[in-house]
Amino acid sequence: MFQDEARFGRMVRIRRCWAPWPARPMVGNGYEREFLYVYGAVSPLQGQFDWMITHIMNTTHMSEFLAQVSSAHRRDFIVMVVDGASSHKAHDLVVPENMRLLRLPPYSPELNPQEHVWDE
């Protein structure tokens, strides 16, 4: 399986608002940011896709995602291909017994089919 994560969100700049005439409200000039992070793993040969949505991307959530994939494929031994993200190399990353991580060389997203899932 090939694993990757992505960030989806919105950045809104608040500049105007509606108010009844003749009121003239003061609108602060600020940004609103909201993001969601998605961990995904795809198996192109089997046509399977596993995913998990979180509000933060860190080693703890990566460990949870690996456990989720492991439990979904209990009877299989999984070779999970990952990129060089820091959460994939952390010492406190928990890798399930039926899974091994295979790291891609640096700067090689073209070797990871999961990268193209986010393009859709």
Which residues fall in each region the model found?
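Short functional hotspots at interaction and active-site rims
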Residues: 1-120
